[in-house]
């Protein structure tokens, strides 16, 4: 089974693209959760053989603990993205259009909840930037992403 999550962002700043990545993670997790609950996404050892399918096999019901364990095998870590920027030497988080269009340097950071980077995309549009400034951008992005992971967990808590 394959799931495609498609977010068409036709005209947007970095913050909108990052928000769509973060929202797509929630959509994917909810879709997987629903497939597991409906018996359409089962652990490998519980999947029917072709012969069982032909003979009227019924999907087993997983306990809530089994569902959560399987969900975490399917999607081991949540994903989020956030934008950061450097404007006249100051570091900003989650740039809106005005900040994004005035940024000397802007960066999109995509990361997993276990702390692994998926993407660091930064551009010195109006200026170059130092290693120290890069570290400050990443540190602020990391703090913002930690907050997004907390929000994602709160949203997903209790939703089946």
Summary of predicted features, one role per range:
Residues 1-160:
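Polyanion-binding surfaces on beta-sheet-dominated domains and ring/shell assemblies
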């Amino acid at each position: 089974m394959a799931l495609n999550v498609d977010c068409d962002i036709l005209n947007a700043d970095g913050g909108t693209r990052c928000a769509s990545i973060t929202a797509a993670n929630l959509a994917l997790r909810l879709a997987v959760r629903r497939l597991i609950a409906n018996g359409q996404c089962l652990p490998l050892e519980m999947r029917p053989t072709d012969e069982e399918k032909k003979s009227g096999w019924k999907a087993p019901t997983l306990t809530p603990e089994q569902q959560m364990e399987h969900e975490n095998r399917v999607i081991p870590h949540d994903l989020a993205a956030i934008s950061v920027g450097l404007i006249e030497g100051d570091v900003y988080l989650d740039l809106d259009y005005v900040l994004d269009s005035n940024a000397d340097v802007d960066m999109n950071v995509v990361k997993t909840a276990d702390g692994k980077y998926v993407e660091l995309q930064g551009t010195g549009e109006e200026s170059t930037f130092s290693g120290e400034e890069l570290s400050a951008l990443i540190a602020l992005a990391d703090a913002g992403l930690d907050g997004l992971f907390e929000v994602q967990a709160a949203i997903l808590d209790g939703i089946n």
